[in-house]
């Protein structure tokens, strides 16, 4: 899905298929379609918007608003391991191991593809 028009981003990702390049005026609508229409999610290193979208989907899975198997590949191990210390979240009791079952952190395109295709079978 196309990013929201932001003043500091001048163009869409050139790798998005034209048929999948949508414009959204409102963030909430983009996130709804993002969660509703996607079968899997690949998250690349990013800023607050990327984190917002990731945590939105994780919250929907945790609260069972998304009940289907929804694999999430988090690409870029160093970036995400520095950013998210899930062990601390587990220690505080705010997430469980089950909450992390949908996450797959990797640097390998091959492993990411394998993970998604196995989960969606």
Language-model segments: residues:
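Short gly/pro/ser/thr-enriched loop/turn and capping motifs at secondary-structure boundaries
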Residues: 6-11, 50, 79-82
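Short glycine/serine/threonine-rich phosphate/pyrophosphate-binding segments
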Residues: 49-56
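C-terminal functional extensions of proteins
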Residues: 74-121
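C-terminal binding/interaction regions
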Residues: 28-33, 37-43, 61, 68, ...
């Amino acid at each position: 899905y196309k990013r929201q028009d932001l003043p500091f981003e001048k163009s869409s990702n050139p790798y998005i298929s034209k048929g999948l390049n949508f414009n959204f005026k409102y963030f909430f609508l983009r996130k709804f379609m993002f969660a509703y229409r996607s079968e899997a999610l690949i998250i690349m290193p990013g800023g607050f918007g990327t984190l917002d979208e990731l945590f939105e989907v994780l919250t929907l899975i945790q609260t069972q608003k998304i009940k289907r198997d929804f694999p999430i590949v988090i690409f870029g191990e160093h970036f995400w391991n520095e950013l998210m210390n899930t062990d601390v979240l587990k220690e505080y009791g705010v997430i469980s191991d089950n909450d992390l079952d949908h996450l797959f952190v990797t640097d390998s395109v091959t492993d990411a593809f394998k993970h998604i295709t196995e989960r969606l079978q």
